[in-house]
């Protein structure tokens, strides 16, 4: 999949925009298959789809991609234009007025959310001079210091049956971040995981940090911080 090329440095920082190599999307797909999920019965949603890397995944009832970045969506549409069944693309702010209806998903549909949602701590001093606090509106119940946490909260509102996404490992292992996930951790538990390095996405960065490919399943028990403290995370061989 083509790397993101149309955003300047400030836009990239504000949107947390890094696009996902095929090797990572294959790991996500394999994680879903290993969980023995009958994917043909599920709608697949990537609510921050960029160029559509995760929409290449096959075998789902329908593939839907949404993004606030119109240029990225236009590129994605060109990439998929010759597909017999192309994904449904939606140009929208996925953190505003969040509902299944917004994404053309029935309340009765089984739903899997995948992707590499933006992550960007807007209160961090790192490159703070380039960050815009109010770059895009966010529903009040989703507002957080890091936009990636906002996305995870939005997945709970959408009541996805399974979620397989990339996000900083610190969302789970740092207790303050974990608690800031709010209702997400009440309704989901970690089913599988693989840790990778942020170097994959930003090799010229001033510093690297661990990212987890995390598979979550919705249930009535959720998870607490003790569960995470005792969880054995896997790494790439």
Predicted feature descriptions by range:
Residues 78-107:
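S-adenosyl-L-methionine
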Residues 54-55, 120-124, 171-176, 223-224:
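Short catalytic/ligand-binding loop motif for oxyanion handling, primarily in non-cytosolic enzymes
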Residues 1-77, 98:
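Class I S-adenosyl-L-methionine
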Residues 208-237:
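Flexible, glycine-/basic-rich loop-and-beta segments that form/coincide
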Residues 35-39, 104-109:
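Glycine-rich phosphate-binding loop signature in dinucleotide/nucleotide-binding domains
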Residues 120-144:
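Mobile active-site "lid"/loop adjacent to the S-adenosyl-L-methionine
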Residues 141-200, 214:
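Conserved Class I SAM-dependent methyltransferase catalytic core
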Residues 112-127, 154-155, 164:
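Internal, well-ordered alpha/beta segment that forms a basic, Gly-enriched binding/recognition surface
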């Amino acid at each position: 999949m083509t790397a993101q090329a149309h955003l300047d440095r400030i836009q990239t920082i504000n949107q947390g925009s890094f696009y996902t190599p095929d090797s990572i999307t294959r790991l996500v797909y394999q994680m879903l298959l290993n969980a023995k999920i009958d994917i043909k019965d599920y709608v697949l949603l990537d609510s921050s789809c960029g160029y559509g890397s995760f929409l290449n995944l096959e075998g789902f009832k329908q593939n839907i991609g949404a993004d606030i970045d119109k240029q990225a969506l236009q590129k994605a549409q060109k990439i998929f234009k010759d597909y017999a069944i192309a994904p449904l693309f939606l140009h929208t702010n996925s953190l505003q007025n969040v509902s299944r209806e917004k994404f053309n998903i029935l309340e009765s549909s089984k739903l899997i959310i995948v992707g590499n949602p933006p992550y960007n701590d807007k209160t961090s001093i790192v490159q703070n001079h380039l960050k815009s606090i109010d770059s895009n509106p966010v529903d009040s119940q989703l507002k957080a210091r890091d936009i990636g946490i906002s996305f995870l909260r939005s997945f709970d509102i959408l009541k996805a049956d399974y979620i397989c996404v990339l996000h900083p490992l610190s969302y789970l292992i740092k207790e303050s971040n974990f608690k800031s996930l709010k209702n997400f951790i009440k309704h989901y538990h970690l089913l599988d995981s693989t840790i990778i390095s942020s170097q994959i996405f930003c090799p010229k960065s001033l510093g690297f940090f661990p990212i987890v490919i995390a598979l979550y399943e919705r249930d009535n028990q959720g998870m607490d911080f003790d569960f995470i403290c005792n969880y054995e995370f896997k790494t790439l061989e």
